[in-house]
Amino acid sequence: KDLYSEADFNKMKAEALFLRTFFYNELVVHYGDVPLMLTSAKMGDGYDKKIRTPRAEVVSQMLEDIDFAIKWLPNIAYTDGHAVQGSAVVLKCRILLNDQRYSDVAKLAGDYIHDPNNPFDLADDYAGIFFGKQENNPEIMFSIQFKAPDDFHALDQMVGSRMTIFPSFNLRASYEPNDPRIKMTMYEIGDPWPNNEKSGLFEEDGNKAEGLIPFTQLAFKKYVNPNVAVPKASTLSDQHIVKMRYADLLLMYAEAMFESGQGNDPLALKALNDVRQRPGVNMPVKPQLTREIIRNERRVELAYEGIRYYDIIRWDIAKDVIPTVQYDELSLIHISEPTRPISI
C-alpha cells in the first residue's frame, strides 16, 4: 500500500471489489443465501465448512463494495479489460433491480446516462459488438477479453458449428417483423453458412460439417466468426464475451422508470427508443412504455447474452414461460426430455 498513491491503491482495490461483487451477484441470484467470505481462504481454517450467510447480508456487503468501486474507478471508456466506473454502475443497477428497488435504479442509471461526462454510447453496428468491431467499442462496458492463439475459447466450434445451444421458436417469434436484429442474432434457412461444405447455406438438415440437426432450424450468429474453419475453431476463437453494454443500462433505466411510476417521463421512453433506433436497426419508435414492450425489447436486444435467465427469475415468470418453450411452431419441449440447451 505504501508504494502507491491513495488514488492508485483505491483504484486497484475498487477493481477487486467489483469482481467480488460481480461473482457474488451470480451466486445470490442462483442460490440466495451463500457463504460470505471477506478474507483470503487458507488451508486448515475450516473455510470449506463455512455456513451460508443470509441473502440480505450478502447483498448489503455487495452494495457497500460496489459503492466503493463507483467512487474510485475512473469514469472513462472501457477498453482493456479493466472495470471502469460505468461497469460498476451497471452492476449496482442489476443488484438493485433484483430487489425491485426501482426508484433507486431510475436515479442511479438516469444520473449516469444523462451526465455530460458519460463516455458510453450505442454502437452504430449491432453485429460488430459481438464480432469484428469490439476494440474500443463505445457500447461495451465490461467484457471477458481473449487474444488467440495464446488466450482463446471454443465458442465458434460449440455454437457456430456443433450448435450445442440454439434459439427456440419462441425467441424467434418474439421479434417484430423486419427487425434487422434477427439476421444479426441468428441463422435461418437459406442464410450463408460457412459450415456447410456443399452448398454454403444453412439448410433444413442443419450442419453438414458435424451432422447435427438443429431442431428449431435456427442457429446463433452472435459471437460467431464466419472466417474460422470448423477444425480450427477450438483454438482460434478470441471474440470478447460481452458481459455489460450500454443498451442494457438504457433498458434497465426505462424499466425502472416505468415500474416506479415514472413511465410517462419522456426520458424513459427515449431510452427504449434510442435502443430501437440505433443506426442499422432503425425499428419504429414506440409511442409509450408498457411492461410488455419493455420486457420484450430486453428479450430481443439482449438475446444470447446471458441476461434472459436473470430477467425470468426477477420477473417471476418461469412458471409461465418454461412450460411453453417450443422447438418449432408445433412442438413443445418437455422439461423431463433430455435435449440440447436452448435459448428462450
Where are these regions (language model features)?
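A low-complexity, Ser/Thr/Gly/Pro-enriched, surface-exposed linker/loop concept
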Residues: 156-162
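N-terminal low-complexity segments that are often proline-rich with Ser/Thr-Pro
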Residues: 342-344
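An acidic, gly/pro-interrupted, aromatic-rich
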Residues: 164-186
